[in-house]
Structures are given as C-alpha cells and as structure tokens.
Design a protein with these regions (language model features):
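Extreme N-terminal regulatory/targeting segments of RNA polymerase sigma factors
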Residues: 1-19
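DNA-recognition helix of helix-turn-helix
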Residues: 86, 90, 158, 162-186
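Short amphipathic alpha-helical boundary/capping segments
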Residues: 13-19, 27, 131-140
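A short, charge-rich alpha-helical start-of-domain segment used by transcription regulators
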Residues: 15-41, 51-54, 65
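Structural recognition of an alpha-helix C-terminal capping motif at a helix-to-coil junction
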Residues: 55-62, 66, 75-87
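Acidic, proline/glycine-rich intrinsically disordered inter-domain spacer in sigma factors
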Residues: 26, 108-135
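Arg/Lys-rich amphipathic alpha helix in sigma70-family domain 2
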Residues: 83-104, 113, 118, 126
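A short pre-motif secondary-structure segment
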Residues: 147-148
Length: 186
C-alpha cells in the first residue's frame, strides 16, 4: 500500500504542474493576441528593425512564460512585458550600436501608409504630414518620445513608469512637455 501511494504522488504532482503550465500558456497566448501588434509597433518606434523586432518579441513572450512558471508577479503583465521588450531593445541597440531605422520603411512594412486606392495627392499629403510629425518627434527628448509612444499605446502613467523605470510624476511631466513641444513644432 505504501508503495502505491508513493507512486501516485509524483503522478499527481506531474499532472498539477502540467495543468498549471497549460493555464500559463493560455494566459501568455491571450496576452500575445492582445499586445503583439502594439508591442511590435513600439519596438519599431524605438528603431528596431523588423527581423530583430520579431526576435525581441518572441524572446519577450518566452521570458514572460518563464516568469509565470517561476511564480512571478501577475499583477501587471502588460507593463512587465513592455519593460522586458524595452530592455531587450536597448540591449540590442547598445550591443549592435544600431542606427534608428527609417520610419517610412517601417510604416511600409507595417501597412501604415495610405492605400493604393487613395489619390496620389492624398498619399503625398499623408506622407508629408507623417514626415512633419516624425521630424517633430525627433526634436523631443528620448524620454518624452518613449512616454508619448507608450501613452499612445493606451498605457496608464503607472504602467509607463513601470516599463521605463521612472516615477509616475516624471512620466506625467514627460507626456505634458512632449505634447506641448509637439504642438509648437507642428
């Protein structure tokens, strides 16, 4: 009898771990479905090329899964994910000493340009507006650009603070000053 009980315990433990892993995978997949497009856009904004961005995205979600398997905090997984992707992008940029990619090329890759059905004049106006906006963005500090980009992704100040490792008040200042400067420049 004792031997039978000891044999069933590892099986129960294995089943429990398996079921927990299945739940965590579902959670990661749900978060992927909700956030991967916006997160990829954010990486593109940071100057990460498309291929590298896909790798960083994949590594970020793998790290998220491992974080959850290790029993990590689940209170704000979206901010956690952005912080990891942000840090991976910064590490890539510093190790590769990569220059920022052309935003117009990224817009083409992500489909953010006007459709072919639009008139040539509309397309030209859209491209000119986008160029003016990008030129204005380049005049902001890196912190202001990052805060505004994450805010445009729908993040709250608290989440942005977590991602960028800043205080909430600093995030608020960066957003406010960034918007004011954009209004002046555009």
């Amino acid at each position: 009898m004792e031997q039978a009980d000891s044999l069933s315990l590892p099986s129960a433990t294995w089943e429990t771990r398996y079921l927990e892993d299945v739940k965590l995978r579902r959670l990661v997949l749900e978060l992927y479905d909700r956030e991967h497009v916006a997160l990829r856009r954010y990486l593109s904004f940071l100057g990460v090329e498309a291929d590298t961005g896909r790798e960083i995205l994949q590594e970020s979600f793998l790290k998220l899964h491992q974080h959850l398997l290790d029993g990590g905090d689940q209170s704000n997984l979206r901010a956690w994910l952005y912080r990891v992707a942000h840090n991976l992008a910064r590490n890539w940029q510093s190790s590769a000493r990569a220059a920022k990619t052309d935003f117009l090329a990224d817009a083409t890759a992500t489909g953010d340009l006007p459709s072919r059905a639009a008139s040539a004049e509309d397309q030209l106006l859209t491209v000119e507006r986008a160029e003016r906006f990008r030129a204005a963005l380049r005049q902001l500090s890196a912190a202001q650009r990052e805060c505004l980009t994450l805010r445009a992704q729908g993040m709250k100040y608290r989440e942005i603070a977590e991602v960028l490792n800043l205080s909430v008040s600093t995030v608020g200042e960066n957003v406010t000053r960034g918007l004011e400067k954009l209004k002046e420049l555009i």
